[in-house]
Amino acid sequence: MWQAISRLLSEQLGEGEIELRNELPGGEVHAAWHLRYAGHDFFVKCDERELLPGFTAEADQLELLSRSKTVTVPKVWAVGADRDYSFLVMDYLPPRPLDAHSAFILGQQIARLHQWSDQPQFGLDFDNSLSTTPQPNTWQRRWSTFFAEQRIGWQLELAAEKGIAFGNIDAIVEHIQQRLASHQPQPSLLHGDLWSGNCALGPDGPYIFDPACYWGDRECDLAMLPLHTEQPPQIYDGYQSVSPLPADFLERQPVYQLYTLLNRARLFGGQHLVIAQQSLDRLLAA
C-alpha cells in the first residue's frame, strides 16, 4: 500500500520518500496514519480493498464541499488501492477543539454553504454513508417523501434487520411524511453529520471532515447541534447572523434529530435504544 501511495504522491510532488509513518489512535472505523512524504504531511485512511468505493465517495464529497468555496475541508491527494488495501490520502491538519470565535466563523461558513448553488431536487448523484451506515440518496422532488422514506424509513428497516423493532414502519413513515407535508424548502448542500467529532480548528481556521453529504433541508445540519453539548453554541449564532432560521424551525427539529438517534440506536444499542424510542413516541403522540 505504501508503495502505491508513494507513486501517486510522486506524480504530484515529484520524487521523494516516506520520512514519517505513525499510526494514529482512535481509528474506530478505519486505520489512520500520519504520513510525511517529501516534506508534506498527510492523513491516510486505509482498510480492506473491498472498501474502496467508500473512500471514493468520501473523496467526491470533500471535492463537492471544496467546490462551494464556503467551507474548509482537507484537500484530497489520492484515493486508490493495491492488491490488499484501499486508501484515502488527505492533508494532515492537526485538530484542536473549536473555541467560541472559530465556532462563530464556522457557523457563518455553514450558512453560506447552504446558500450555494441552485439544486431543484433532494438527494445526491451517489449513495454514501452516515458513519458506517449506508445512506441512500435517490433524487426526489418532494422533501417530505425523501426524508420520510430515505432517512427514517431506511433506518427503521435496517434496525428491523437486526431484530430491533420501533413500531409499524409504514405507519411511522406516513406520520413523518405528514409532519413535513407542508414544508418544501430550497435544497441545500448539507455536511450531513455535523457534530463536534467532525469539526475542528486547524492552522488556518475551522474545518470540517467526514461528511455524509446530500441536498436536503438546511435545518437538518442545525438540528444536530443540540444533540452534542460539547459543540460550542456560537456555531448557531454565527449561522443566524448570515441566514436566520424560520420561526417554526424548532417544530421540525425533533423530526430531523430522529434520523441520528435511530442510527445511534442501531449501532450502539443500550441507552441509545431508549432515547430513540422515547423521541419517536413523542413525535407520534404530537
UniProtKB/Swiss-Prot annotation:
Residues the record lists as binding ATP: D91, Y92, L93
EC number: 2.7.1.-
A Pfam family per the record: Fructosamin_kin
Enzyme class at the top of the EC tree: transferase
Keywords: ATP-binding, Kinase, Nucleotide-binding, Transferase
Catalytic residues (UniProt): D193
Molecular function GO terms recorded: ATP binding; kinase activity
Family the entry assigns: Belongs to the fructosamine kinase family.
Protein name per Swiss-Prot or TrEMBL: Probable ketoamine kinase YniA
Protein's gene: yniA
